[in-house]
């Protein structure tokens, strides 16, 4: 339980596994990128901004492959980088980013019963990055697979408290982005 809380909220927070509050943990499509077709965007690790964890549309491309809904990014989806120096980088889907298909070096988790921004915010903590460092240090090439990501400890509380915290954090993130 954090030391500072909004008034009226009390009680212990619950420690659970990411895989207990999210579904999927699916790998993205194995396709090359091609020129943007005007509709279908392809998000790769390099399209996730390092500082803001948002989709960067500086170099929009489309996937060069068979487009199925299996690889579409949807509301409540979090994408996680699974290999290389960017292991641990994450992105929370926003409808304003448009129709996105995700690439094979990303893993998609859909947060089902909790506030996705609240969960996403926990993927930007010192605790998370320490976990990423430990989990990905086992071999010469850093990486975390879907089963390992699903084991990451997540803290949860009531949906009302999560939503209030998420709203505050998103307002702060928006404010920082406009500076």
Language-model segment annotations:
Residues 7, 64, 107-111, 151-156:
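Short, well-ordered beta-strand elements within core beta-sheets of diverse protein domains
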Residues 99-105, 137-160:
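A short glycine-rich beta-alpha junction/loop motif
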């Amino acid at each position: 339980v954090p030391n500072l809380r909004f008034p009226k909220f009390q009680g212990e927070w619950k420690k659970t596994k990411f895989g207990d509050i999210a579904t999927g943990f699916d790998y993205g499509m194995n396709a090359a990128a091609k020129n943007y077709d005007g509709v279908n965007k392809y998000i790769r690790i390099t399209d996730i901004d390092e500082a803001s964890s948002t989709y960067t549309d500086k170099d929009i491309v489309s996937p060069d492959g068979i487009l199925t809904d299996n690889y579409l990014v949807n509301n409540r989806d979090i994408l996680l980088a699974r290999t290389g120096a960017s292991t641990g980088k994450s992105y929370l889907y926003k409808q304003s980013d448009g129709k996105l298909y995700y690439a094979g070096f990303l893993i998609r988790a859909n947060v089902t019963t909790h506030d996705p921004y609240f969960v996403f915010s926990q993927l930007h903590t010192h605790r998370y990055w320490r976990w990423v460092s430990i989990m990905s240090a086992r071999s010469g090439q850093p990486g975390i697979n879907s089963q390992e990501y699903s084991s990451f400890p997540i803290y949860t509380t009531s949906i009302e408290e999560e939503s209030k915290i998420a709203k505050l954090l998103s307002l702060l993130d928006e404010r920082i982005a406009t500076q």
